[in-house]
Structure formats: structure tokens, C-alpha cells
Amino acid sequence: MKLEQCDTKKLTVMLDQLASAIEELLLTGLTTASDATVQTLNISFQEASRAGLLRLGSTLRVACEELTRYTKEHPDFSAKRFSFFLNRSWLLSKGLSKAIKESDREEFERLTWNAPVTPVRQLEVVTLGVSKKYVPNAFCAFEFRMRRVEPAGVEAAASVANGGVEESGARGTTDVAGNTGTAGGGILPGQKLIWSVVFPVKPNQNLPPESFLHLPQKQKFIAYCLIEGRRVTFGDAFVAFEKSGTGRISLGDKSTVMQGDEYTDWSKFISWSPEAAIDRLNAYEPGPLDLEIELQEEVFIEDWEMLPEPLRETESHIVYPLSYRGGRIDAVVSRGLDGATMRAALDKAVAQKKKPVVFGLMHYEKCRLTLQPLSFMGKKGPEYATLSRDKVDRVALLKALNL
């Protein structure tokens, strides 16, 4: 995001109010924190996300989560985690406000951590996995990890022309959808893509997290259509490429989302190169605001086994020790409601003689390889193990939301 693209007046007011709210909370102490305090930070989180301030938004999300735990006297509340992310939120809000007031474009872009946005006329994708974060009385967030695919007719024709062997496109070309690839990252077949959505959760609104996926979006689609194993076409959308090379999709008022045919060629995506990950780590230059998860990358883990040791528990996660390629990976699953479905799926996978391929997000924490599993790859495609498949009563959902 560029500074000139922002509503600087509105953004400055929001950032200054956020900084003041944090300062007031620190001056008066946590004992004065209430549901209203949680709502203030939660509204700031939603506004930051809508404004495209991804780094501030993700930081506020964690601070809101811990503050909610404190006000509800939840045993998993972590004072260390809360103070870290609250302090980080204050630093980012003050820094961004200062950059806006001084018209410092370079500093603004560094703190927002956003890449330039590219308009895309048409983009056909499939979903490999979904991460879910649910904080009662605050929000429910989903992040869909996808790959770009060729339209069905073109994909079949290309396969026949190449003797049944797919040929990867080169960067700097124009693809069949009319999207021009550039040296900075063309939107070509196989490109990693993300689309995320956040839903506010009202106090005492006891709904299954997955029920929010059935709510209509502004573009007249429901997010559930992304997890039915079918092609989905985004029209008149926007893509911003992160430093990792992953593209983040955003939608405008004129954007469209259409579900297509069932997708079957899932096995083509199952690959991961540890060597490439090592190269990225060697080229990485750390900064004072960086987090471990900002170095995360999508991985496929094959031929893994459970190590013969008990599960380990932290403040917020259950840790499954896995053996992979002679090394160790810690697979972490939330202890909360948002991790219940994955815990059941992972327990089932551990018990199987032939372990399924795991798709997930890996980052490096305290010299450990840490994996957040998202799905298991089967013959018919991914099993979205983070999401419950229980039937949603749409009438009850709309009634609960007063829609």
C-alpha cells in the first residue's frame, strides 16, 4: 500500500486513538479492562485490516485475543504474550502516525509491510488449506491458502500438446487470462495465493466458527464455496505480492467470485524444497519488529512418523513431535475451540499405518522447525482438517445475527 492511496485523515485519527487507548490501559492498569476495552481494540483491529495495515492488524489480533482471555479470567491468559503484542501495537501505531504526518512514504511502506497492488482481470484458483482463528466475543478469521490453475479447457489442451506432461510457464510472459507476468512475480499457474476474511463476533454470540463461512459477502458469494474441492474464479480482483513471493488477493466492490467444476489434479502441487527454504533464511535480514511467523512458508510433509514421546503442552498449543527426513518437526495445534477439529484429525492420522501427506505452514521458533498443519492430502484432494464439517443451520445462523 502506498501512502498516497490512503485516507490519511481517517487513518491518522484511528492510529492516534489506538495509541491513546493503549496508553490509558497501561496507566490505569489491567484491572480496569472491561468488555468495552476489548471492543475498542477489536474495532481498531478490524479497521486496520480493512485499511490494509496487515502488520498492525495481525498484531492487534493477538493483543485482543489475550485481553479477552484476561477479562474472562481464562486460565490460558499469558501476561508475557499480551504485553509483547500490546507494546508492538503501540510502536506500530505511533510510527505509522508519525510517517503519515511527515509524509514519509518509505517509512510508511516499511511499517505497513505491504507490497504494491496489481489489478487482475481473472484468476482461477483451488484451495489447499485453511487456517482458522476464533476468539469469543471478538472475531473469527479465516485464511485460505490457494494455487492458481489454468482454466479447465486450456489445462487439458496444454497437457495433450505436451504429451501429457505439464510445462511450467516462464516469468515475464502473458498468461491465458490476460494477466501479464513480470520479473517481480507474474500470476502464472502454480502461483501461491492467499485470501483472508475476518468476521466480528458479538458478545454472547455462541455460533460455530465455520458457520460464518455461510454468510454472504459484499461480492454476493459465500466463503464456503472455496472449500468444496472446486475451481473458483476471482474476477476484477487485486493481488499484492509479499517478499516470500506469495500473492495476497483482495476484492473490491466490482469484484466477482464464481465457483466452477470439480478439480482433480491435486497431486501436482505436492512438493517442497528445503534447499530453497535455506536460501531464503540465509538471505533474510532481521528487523526489530519481525516475528518468527513472518518467515513462515507453505510446506508438504511426506513420509513422517510420530516420535515415541508424549505430547507436550504450552500456554496455547498442544505439540505433536514428528520425525521427518531424520530430523524433528514440532506440529502445533491450538488448545482452544479453534483447534478441536484439527486435534481430532491429527490423532486419527497418527494412528494410521500409512501417514497422509500434511500441508501446512512452517516457521522457525527457538531453533525448532514448527509446523501448523492445515490439511491432509488424499486421493480426492485436501481434507480441510481445521474446519468442522458439521451441518450448519442457516436459519438459526441468520436469526442469531439478526439478518
How does the language model describe each region?
Residues 1-403:
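Helix-loop junction hotspots and adjacent acidic micro-motifs that serve as functional foci
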